[in-house]
Swiss-Prot record:
It comes from Moritella profunda. Pathway: Amino-acid biosynthesis; L-arginine biosynthesis; N(2)-acetyl-L-ornithine from L-glutamate: step 2/4. This is Acetylglutamate kinase. The keyword ATP-binding applies. It is found in: Cytoplasm. It catalyses: N-acetyl-L-glutamate + ATP = N-acetyl-L-glutamyl 5-phosphate + ADP. Its main location: cytoplasm.
C-alpha cells in the first residue's frame, strides 16, 4: 500500500529541525496545510520534537546537553525543563501558527488519552522513553470533529514518570495507532549518500549498508530506523522530505514523489 492508494487514510506529518524556530517557514507550512485541506478531506496529525527550544533553554540554565547514538541523554533532573520546552513552548508555537491559519488545533502529548504507550528506555539515556502504538479513540474522535491534533514527543509511563521520546519514534507510534501514512519533514531533502546526493528510494538492506559504512549516522540513523519500522509495521512506504521548498508541500501531501521513499 502506498500513500497514493488511499487518500482517506490519516496522514501524520513529523515536524523537526530548524523549522520550529523559523516563523516564516511555519507560516508557509500552515498555509500549505490550509490549501491542502481546502481540497482534501484527509485527516492530518502533526507530531513534533523541538530540540532547538530544548538547547536554548538548557543553555540559559548552563546545562550541557549530550547525545548518544543520535538520541538526547535526559537526566531525570532535567526532564521538567525538557517537558516545558517540548510540551510547552514548541507545542504552543505550532498551535499559534495553526490558529493563525484558521485550523481547529488541539495540543497534545503522547500521554493524552493513551494515544501512545511509553516505557522507559533501557539504553542508559536517563528519562528517555520508548514508544509504541496506543489507543486511537481520542485521536479518531478529534479527527472526526475536524480538529488538527498537534502532538509533542513527551510521554508518561505507567509509573507516572515524565519521559522524553525521540520525535521520529513518536511519529511512528502515532502512525501505528491510527494505521496512518507518515511523512517526516526535516532540514534536508531526504536521505543523502556519501556524495551528499539525494537517495530517491531506501530499503532495510540498503540502509544497513549505509549505516555500517558510517554514511547514515546520528540523528539521521534514528530517523531512518524509525521510518523503516513504520514501513514494516504499516506495510506502506514512508517519505522523508524537506520543509524548505514550501511550493512543493501541497504536491508532497497529495502523494507526489518528493524526497526519499522508505520501504521495508
Amino acid at each position: 500500500m502506498t500513500m497514493t492508494a488511499t487518500m482517506t487514510t490519516p496522514l501524520v506529518l513529523k515536524l523537526g529541525g530548524a523549522l520550529l524556530e523559523n516563523e516564516t517557514a511555519l507560516e508557509q507550512l500552515f498555509t500549505a496545510l490550509s490549501e491542502y485541506k481546502s481540497t482534501s478531506s484527509r485527516p492530518l496529525v502533526l507530531v513534533h520534537g523541538g530540540g532547538c527550544f530544548v538547547d536554548e533553554l538548557l543553555a540559559k540554565m548552563n546545562i550541557v546537553s549530550e547525545k548518544k547514538n543520535g538520541l538526547r541523554i535526559t537526566p531525570f533532573s532535567d526532564i521538567g525543563y525538557i517537558t516545558g520546552a517540548l510540551a510547552g513552548t514548541a507545542n504552543k508555537v505550532l498551535m499559534a501558527q495553526g490558529l493563525k491559519s484558521g485550523a481547529k488545533v488541539v495540543g497534545l502529548s503522547l500521554a493524552d488519552g493513551g494515544i501512545a504507550t511509553v516505557t522507559q528506555s533501557t539504553a542508559g539515556l536517563g528519562a528517555v522513553g520508548e514508544c509504541e502504538a496506543g489507543d486511537p479513540t481520542l485521536l479518531t474522535a478529534l479527527l472526526s470533529g475536524g480538529f488538527l491534533p498537534i502532538i509533542s514527543s513527551i510521554g508518561i509511563d505507567a509509573q507516572g514518570q515524565l519521559l522524553n521520546v525521540n520525535a521520529d519514534q513518536a511519529a511512528t507510534a502515532i502512525c501505528e495507532t491510527l494505521d496512518a501514512d507518515l511523512v517526516m519533514l526535516s532540514d534536508v531533502a531526504g536521505i543523502l549518500d556519501a556524495d551528499m546526493q539525494l537517495i530517491p528510494e531506501m530499503n532495510s538492506n540498503y540502509a544497513a549498508e549505509l549505516i555500517a559504512a558510517g554514511v547514515i549516522n546520528g540523528g539521521m540513523e534514528v530517523k531512518v530506523k524509525a521510518a523503516l519500522k513504520a514501513a514494516a509495521s504499516l506495510n506502506r512506504d514512508i517519505k522523508l522530505a524537506s520543509w524548505k521548498v514550501p511550493e512543493r508541500l501541497v504536491a508532497l501531501l497529495n502523494g507526489e514523489v518528493e524526497g526519499t521513499k522508505v520501504s521495508s
